[in-house]
């Protein structure tokens, strides 16, 4: 059963998609359960159109997560992603990664809709897929979901907000989606008891005064290295405090600045109860580590720019 706000999001999307062919987007904060919203809408679109539905996500983990929620809700769906080892179109609802789908578009026919998870990261590949499927079906519906429907440098990714206010040229450049149909933020979810209020701790260990954002809105890699790497004693003191403060917690995720910094962090964590995932971690090992963390077989999971988007640790 959907939570009330999830049902409201579904209803808003249904109302919009039922009356026009324009694209729309749902803005739901991290932790809102977008996978459940996707599952409900994919099932509804298939049942009302008797056609296929394609659900895209940027990573293997997200594709499997969304697929799993759909199956758990009682539906039947296929996986189409090389990284999962499956390229199936057996069922009407298909969960896939953009790269794998693009390479096999001749197989993708009779689709009623494309649902894009993490839609703020919409790429030329995703647009190419949508254009191809729309050429095959001019009535194709397109729906996006994101916790941050905004791109640095180009602004909001929709033309109209939930109140039909046109987003000005100062706030957006060439937005892909026509309308924001539903929005719920983290504060609302906390106030309603669906998210745990965040608590913060401050440690004076690292000197980050030299860190500055570049033109892409990111920190310079060399400045990050200078601030965080080679500070073994400071790192050890910070991690000791993390271990102490998390004594009653079942799982702890730690986000490190660089791979050398992550290795310093690992040196201060309990051996046998912690693991590290980076972009270089082999797929099989990475999958094994994530399964162990979700199963509470390890408590501390350190990562470097890997588990930053849509990861569900439950």
Predicted regions and their residues:
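Conserved helicase ATPase core of P-loop NTP-dependent helicases/translocases
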Residues: 64, 79-89, 253, 262-265, ...
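Conserved interdomain linker/interface between the two RecA-like ATPase lobes of SF2 helicase motors
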Residues: 175-253
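Post-DEXD/H (motif II) to motif III coupling segment of the RecA-like Helicase ATP-binding lobe
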Residues: 121-198
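Walker A/P-loop
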Residues: 19-42, 255, 302
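Conserved Walker A/P-loop ATP-binding site and its immediately adjacent core
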Residues: 36-37, 46-72, 257-260
């Amino acid at each position: 059963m959907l939570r009330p706000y999830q049902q409201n999001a579904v209803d808003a999307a249904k109302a919009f998609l039922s009356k026009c062919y324009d694209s729309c987007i749902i803005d739901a904060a991290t932790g809102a359960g977008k996978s459940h919203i996707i599952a409900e809408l994919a099932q509804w679109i298939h049942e009302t159109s008797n056609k296929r539905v394609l659900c895209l996500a940027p990573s293997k983990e997200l594709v499997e997560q969304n697929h799993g929620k759909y199956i758990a809700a009682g539906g039947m769906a296929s996986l189409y992603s090389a990284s999962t080892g499956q390229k199936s179109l057996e069922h009407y609802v298909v969960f896939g990664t953009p790269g794998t789908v693009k390479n096999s578009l001749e197989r993708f026919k009779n689709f009623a809709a494309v649902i894009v998870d993490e839609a703020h990261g919409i790429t030329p590949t995703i647009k190419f897929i949508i254009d191809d499927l729309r050429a095959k079906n001019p009535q194709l519906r397109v729906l996006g979901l994101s916790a941050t429907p905004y791109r640095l440098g180009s602004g909001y990714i929709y033309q109209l907000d939930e109140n039909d206010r046109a987003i000005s040229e100062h706030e957006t450049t060439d937005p892909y989606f026509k309308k924001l149909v539903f929005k719920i933020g983290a504060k609302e979810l906390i106030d309603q008891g669906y998210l745990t209020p965040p608590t913060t701790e401050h440690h004076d260990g690292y000197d980050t005064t030299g860190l500055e954002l570049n033109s892409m809105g990111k920190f310079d890699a060399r400045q990050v290295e200078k601030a965080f790497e080679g500070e073994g004693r400071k790192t050890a003191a910070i991690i000791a405090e993390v271990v102490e403060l998390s004594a009653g917690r079942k799982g702890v995720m730690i986000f490190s600045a660089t791979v050398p910094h992550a290795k310093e962090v690992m040196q201060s964590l309990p051996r046998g109860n912690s693991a590290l995932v980076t972009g270089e971690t082999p797929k099989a090992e990475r999958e094994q580590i994530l399964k162990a963390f979700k199963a509470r077989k390890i408590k501390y999971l350190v990562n470097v720019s890997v588990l930053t988007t849509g990861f569900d640790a439950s």
